[in-house]
Amino acid sequence: MIFCKSKKSAERTLEKIQPFIEKKLYLKMNEEKTVVSYVKGVKFLGYTFYIYRGKGRLRVHPKSIAKMKKRIKELTSRSNGWGNEKRRTKLNEYVRGWMNYFKLADVKTFLKSFDGYYRRRIRMIYWKQWKKVRTKFRYLRKLGIEESKAWEYANSRKGYWRIANSPIVNRSLSIQFLEGIGYIFFYDYYQKITVN
């Protein structure tokens, strides 16, 4: 990528650089991918760019975010037949890898929001695993939920996704609990590997 101050300047640069790349470096320029464009919205190695206070900044491209959401959904699917330990390991590996690659981007706000969705997916897995009313009741009690509420939620007919966002399930499978059993979350890991 070559950054210029104006479109005319970019067009002149392209005219000059193309012969150098093809005749001096013996490289072929891809006509479809070689464009003069405003920096906003351009996708490059999963990143996109924007201008803030006169300076170029990095964001994660929407397509990269969509791909990440799809992958998290796959990893938190119970149809893959993994046990909790293997799934947790796979998820943590993905969180570390994704964050280390995109740590240069401005993603704080997105990560805080996405972690809520991510934790809800994890809670849904556990709720599905508990299956029977008595099993749900036993685990809820074990995790500190009072008897009447535990019985009420254990008997709930609400769908898995909906119940995973309920106050009781959020309280029993809290952030502290999930971290305690080894889960890593995007925003926490981002803070750990970046110095702002």
Features from the language model and the residues they span:
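Non-catalytic terminal/accessory segments
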Residues: 1-196
